[in-house]
Amino acid sequence: MTKSENEGGFISHLTELRKRLIHSFILLFIFFIGCYFFSEHLYGFLVEPFANAVNDSGTDRRLIFTALQETFLTYLKVSFFAAFFVTCPYILMQIWKFIAPGLYKHEKIAIVPYLVLTPILFFLGGALVYYLIMPLAIKFFLSFESTGASTGLPIQLEAKVSEYLSLVMKLIFAFGISFQLPVVLSLLARVGMVDAKFLREKRKYVVVMIFAAAALLTPPDPITQIGLAIPLLILYELSIFSVNIIEKKNKKNA
């Protein structure tokens, strides 16, 4: 193959990549506009764990904003997050269509399960945050409120619109990304970088690393830190099981 043919092939790949990125961006923008019309309802969905927790306390609550543009910008962020979440499968499909022609058949068969598993695990991480971690964390933080009997003045939460969204999205992304642990370890096992024996031997170090990562990725309270660490430990054990299966298949095919 001549130099000009190599350059032509490279340019054609760049052109195809550009086309797929543009298509993904256009779809993301369309959904972003659509989601903005429902941004108040989307934000209401995210606020529901907070609303349920504070309603259980029997006191009147509200969310405040201290900057004129704060609520507007918060709704823009909510719209973008929702649009990205909806279009993520399409974006992954575009990436797959770009790289698939350069893969062998057995490589395609090996990668497809991970493309399916990745968004599922992310969704499970986000669902864990929404339905379990957030309600427990909110109740934990609200327990530090005071009526003023021992503090002189009442201590009561006045949560900001933007800060609440930042907390929720930080937790969702932290859990969603952390839940990719089985995918990462299985891929490393397929390329021969780790094996089940190695993962078992390093288990005690991994436990320490998981709790350290949970402390860095979550707010400084034991509820969310333990809530992230325990599922990760379970996923690590499932990863060892998955790597065992991969090793048996590799030996069988060898």
State the predicted function of each range.
Residues 1-254:
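Membrane topogenic/interface segments and analogous intrinsically disordered interaction regions
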